[in-house]
Amino acid sequence: MKRKLSRRELFKNVGAAGAVTLLNVPLGAQQGGNGRQSSPFQQILDHSSKELLAEHEQYLVKIQTAKLIATFDRRYGSLSSIRRKNDELGTNYIGNETNTPGVNPSDSRWTGDVVSTVWRLLGDWRAAKIGLHDIFKMSGEWRRELSGQSGDIRHVEFRDNLFQVRYDGQSANEHGIRSYRLEMSFHPAEDHSLLWDIEIENVTPGVLEVGELGFPLMVNDDYAELYYEPGGQSAISTINNVDFVRTPLRQKLIHEQKVIVHHFIGGHSSYALVQRPLGDAPFLLLHPTNQDTSFECSYKDQDSAFSEHAEGWRGPDILAIHSRATKIRRGWTRNPWVNGHTSVVLQPGEKKNYQMRFVFVDSYEAIREELYQAGNLGIRVLPSMVVQEDTEVLVELQSKSEIDKISFLSDNIKVASRKRSGDKTLLNLSFRKRGQKSIKLHYGDGRWTNLHFYCIEDIETLLKARGKFIVEREFYDNPEDPYHRHHGFLPFDHRVGSAYTDSEEVWEVGDSDEAGFSEPLFLAEKNLYFPREEEVDVLETYVNDCLFKYIQNPTTFEVRASLYWKERLPSSPWGNWTKERSEATWRTYNYVHPANIYHALYRIGKRYGLLKRRKAEDYLRMSYHTCIAWFHAGPWKHIGMMEGSNAIHILEDIKREGWQQEYETLLQEMKECDDVFVSDPYPYSSELIIDQTAHEQVYFFTRYFGDQEKNRKTVQVLKALRGGNQPAWFRYGNDKRGDVCCWYNASLNGMALLSAFEDSGDQDAFLKGYAGVMSVMRNVLPDGMGFNYFICTPGVFSSDPPTTFESGTGLWGFLKSAKSYILNDKTFGLVGCGCRVETTGQAITVIPKDGLRKRMRFTEEKLDLECTQGEFKKVIFDRADGSLELQLEDSTGNVKSAAITLRGLEKGEYKLSYGNSSKRSPSDGTLVVNVAMSEARRVRIEPLRATKS
């Protein structure tokens, strides 16, 4: 029988044995798979994660329903755990001092605590003088009152399945509760959910302004806990996370025993979705239920000592009903958060009652139903919340009553249509002029919910502007640069309006790493769709004078860490790399970017003939050798890389060129990598403790090699990263990565989810994928400046820092993913996503507006159109006879011949008509059409004899 191990024993026992295994056991044995050697590590990994985390806790009492088990800690009056009943893994969704070691209970922020700030009156506030000659004097000052510092007045009772906590009297502690009586209870509801009731009563003799009233939601999300050992080294450095003996175990524990929480904070329809990163339903939902409970802001409590000794964990999120005092105390007055900040004023003896509800839901779609049943709004937005000017966005609002009023909180908002259909209000919105576009929905006798969109300019124009900006503002021309960055690319700082050459993190300005490859990566891929001779010339100059001369060794194909370096001082931080450190070539991630740059140049040469320094085949061979170096370099060679999926396209182009030996060699390297993905239960690790980078490559490799089960599991994990489609532009379709939004993972993982949708028809995967891909375009300004990401933290809420940094990877993902989708929606009928759709009888006219106008999918027919040379201006598809009319154009002036590929056709013979020519062509389901651009204004494709493929 397997011996049970505690969490700390687990890592202690791996210890030295793990280190020996890392050094001496072949990769396959470390990572798993058939024939793996038995080791102390493997014996531990073979335990179920439930056994591994079995802990005994005291002071606990329990409430059970048919669906959940909740335990409460009498010492703190807090919720200690929520588990699904009969859950095979036994995961605790709530954070406590066992799964979040190092917290300080004397200043607690448990789930069940209350965080408040009240206005301490020192005089008559109504007598304030604010006239012309008056001297204004504040009537008092803010004072924090915290249940976590009110243990001296805390009373806890448990009886009859009711857990009650009362704070009665005045706490003697500095930040204890004194101004109000607080009473809370947790009890099961008839529907097997858990209700949390809160009542506050003003016990002062005067009016009481509560400027902050927030509820910590402490969940079991301290991932860093798995990387620390008492008495051992203080931390496992995130940039040296190469302990592959422990990595599968850590990933197993993270995905099965830790949770991820997604928040929608927008009024009465707010919610928190807590789920395992594994992505398996049911999920734990927390949401408001009554008239007075509406969340307006969410933030960390920076004043708390609760988490200061919990290494790597920033503390729980505070879900705030009122946050005016928080705004003032933290200096957000010039940068308030999206919903505004309010106070509540209580007269002496006046009470307020709040209620929240914990319930397990069986699907993401079920979230909307739970909110609807609570009298709030079930919200669905199609297709995204980052929206181009003058394109429609569709909003479905499921509610028990009609929406009373829609208030515009921003300029240039248009409601094109509004109608009530059953229990749903359907809106068709559009926007003009860049910026956040917010609406407030009023309903249900005083309830409200805010929706925040973001309007951007025409994407095609933005992409072309970005390419021009890179060439004109970021291409570095300095033959005297001592670091050999001449004809490389530098990042751009929007604050000073200039590229910059120095950074405390040398790789940021060193022409390698994600920051250094960002600009040429985007520029190369962009020119594959919109070729511009000047930009291609710059790319070839960059390769010749910088990349394939100084960054990459042209003989060994090794890629160095940075061209830039610094002489270290006693006070130098880690990022001040020495010359020796900058010359290191072991970071696997640095190989994928140049491989993709070379590959794009190969395709540019093949399609447009714009190359001057090398032949197209030369670039493909450089890409191939860089891929081989990638799969042999450094410790992360068999971990998913950002943009790693493109190895599949490189491989296919090598095959088309007839390079059989190179094809077989690269195929074998990729297959070995995929074997690790399949054998490792959770192959989603990286150089960081927790990351969203590996998933894209894992998804596409397992799909390519036919590993259906791991591919399905990866889709499930990808969807968990995005949660319940939280309807705010900075969360919709975005992976939960703290408060970082619209980053590269939004588009790269979105690309995978869109592929999953095309394979399966999963509408939820479509929404998560499409919205994520669109979100990165918010980062590009009309002049071509491109931010790296957006920070949605209250008080920040901007692109911080406002630099380009790694922006190119996210835009690369957009370019790979952009497509016009024509689909039948269950609510809105025929919908164009990334395009405008018009119908006449059985004929569908599509005018693409997806940014590229290169790809199109009729989802019901599973018909794909791709124009690799030229652009679709208009497409007419007649469902009655299966004919297609393609109207093409070239916005670049560099396309000599239009190239179109159709996939998903019925087998048979087709008549092609264009210009003054026509011909017949057989199709096995795929049809390739090449037409001189001068004759491509109108191409007609008609089936003559067709059979179902």
Located regions from the model:
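Carbohydrate-binding surface patches
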Residues: 808, 812-908, 926-940
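C-terminal beta-strand-rich structural cap/linker in extracellular carbohydrate-active enzymes
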Residues: 363-365, 922-949
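Short Pro-Gly-centered flexible turn/kink motifs
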Residues: 67, 344-362, 935-942
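Catalytic cores of extracellular degradative/oxidative enzymes
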Residues: 470-754
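Acidic-aromatic substrate-binding/catalytic surfaces of carbohydrate-active enzymes
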Residues: 40-41, 56-173, 226, 232-241, ...
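Acidic (Asp/Glu-rich), glycine- and aromatic
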Residues: 75, 176-180, 189-269, 447, ...
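N-terminal export signals
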Residues: 9-30
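Low-complexity, Pro/Ser/Thr- and charge-rich linker/hinge segments at domain boundaries
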Residues: 222-228, 369-391, 448-491
